[in-house]
Amino acid sequence: MFTMKKSLLLIFFLGTINLSLCEEERNAEEEKRDGDDEMDVEVQKRFLGPIIKMATGILPTAICKGLKKC
């Protein structure tokens, strides 16, 4: 009976460790995926800012020259 309790305790202990390791790995993967999304948004912000500034500078002159009312 004592050896059976020992083996059951060992199985329970190893199962608990296995579950905690899987949970840590899953959390790390989620953080990795979340970090990529944040990086994509940051790159988009960096990319769109200068383009919008250029468009606001070029667009009025293009319209003016296109309509020939300058």
Swiss-Prot record:
Predominant localisation class: secreted
InterPro entries associated with the record: Frog_antimicrobial_propeptide
Name the UniProt record assigns to this protein: Gaegurin-LK2
Domain of life: Eukaryota
Family of the protein in this entry: Belongs to the frog skin active peptide (FSAP) family. Brevinin subfamily.
Alphabetic keyword roster: Amphibian defense peptide, Antibiotic, Antimicrobial, Cleavage on pair of basic residues, Fungicide, Secreted, Signal
Subcellular location(s) of the protein: Secreted
One Pfam family named in its UniProt record: FSAP_sig_propep
GO biological process, one term: killing of cells of another organism
Role played: Has antimicrobial activity against Gram-positive bacteria S.aureus ATCC 2592 (MIC=2.5 uM), S.aureus ATCC 43300 (MIC=2.5 uM) and B.subtilis (MIC=20.0 uM), against Gram-negative bacteria E.coli ML-35P (MIC=50.0 uM), P.aeruginosa PA01 (MIC=10.0 uM) and P.aeruginosa ATCC 27853 (MIC=5.0 uM) and against fungus C.albicans ATCC 2002 (MIC=5.0 uM).
Organism whose genome encodes this protein: Limnonectes kuhlii (Kuhl's Creek frog)
Signal sequence region: 1-22
Record's GO cellular component terms: extracellular region
Residue ranges listed under propeptide: 23-44
Tissue-specificity statement: Expressed by the skin glands.
The keyword 4Fe-4S is assigned to this record: no
